[in-house]
């Protein structure tokens, strides 16, 4: 029996102009896709492409995307075609997480959280925690809190900790640490 080829076949369709019927313009660059495939994989794209909006007309459609950077949007298309993403670079992980939230792609959001978890440092954990809070990335928020608890002495001395504009957040972290040390830690207070 020959090995399965579906994933590789789908990967060859990513950004394939010849087999596309929708073109997204992102940062003045085209991203080619198949409307039926996007609609099958995403409620957001189904509504956009077949929900009665001007984008839902037949023929090759062009859609301007102005709020997602090109490398992030290409990763979204890769995910929609393959149910996975290769090599989430640290510089696009948080924007990709935000886009996954916007486009209602729960699995992609989880993949981003996992990728970010692997790159957390004492210098970036505070900004990642704040981003997770803004974008309702509960899994990432818990990962950040665990990292902060395990490394609070170092995190507290980091540049990331001291750039917080709201001093009450610094006090919250100190109280969190004291409660943790005294066995009274409750995550819900800080999420």
What do these predicted regions represent?
Residues 2, 8-121:
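Canonical BTB/POZ domain core
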Residues 89-98, 102, 111-114, 119-191:
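BTB/POZ-protein C-terminal extensions
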Residues 7-14, 46, 50, 74-77, ...:
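Generic detector of well-ordered alpha-helical segments enriched in charged/polar residues
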């Amino acid at each position: 029996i020959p090995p399965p080829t579906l994933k590789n076949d789908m990967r060859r369709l990513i950004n394939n102009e010849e087999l596309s019927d929708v073109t997204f313009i992102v940062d003045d660059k085209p991203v080619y896709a198949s409307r039926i495939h996007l609609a099958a994989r995403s409620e957001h794209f189904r509504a956009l492409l077949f929900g009665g909006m001007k984008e839902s007309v037949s023929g090759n459609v062009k859609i301007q995307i102005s709020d997602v950077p090109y490398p992030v949007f290409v990763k979204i298309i890769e995910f929609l075609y393959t149910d996975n993403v290769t090599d989430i670079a640290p510089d696009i992980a948080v924007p990709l997480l935000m886009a996954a939230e916007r486009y209602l792609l729960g699995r992609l959001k989880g993949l981003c959280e996992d990728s970010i978890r692997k790159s957390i440092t004492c210098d970036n954990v505070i900004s990642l925690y704040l981003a997770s809070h803004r974008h309702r990335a509960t899994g990432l928020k818990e990962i950040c809190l665990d990292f902060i608890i395990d490394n609070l002495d170092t995190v507290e001395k980091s540049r990331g900790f001291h750039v917080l504009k709201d001093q009450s957040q610094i006090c919250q972290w100190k109280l969190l640490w004291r409660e943790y040390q005294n066995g009274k830690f409750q995550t819900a207070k800080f999420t």
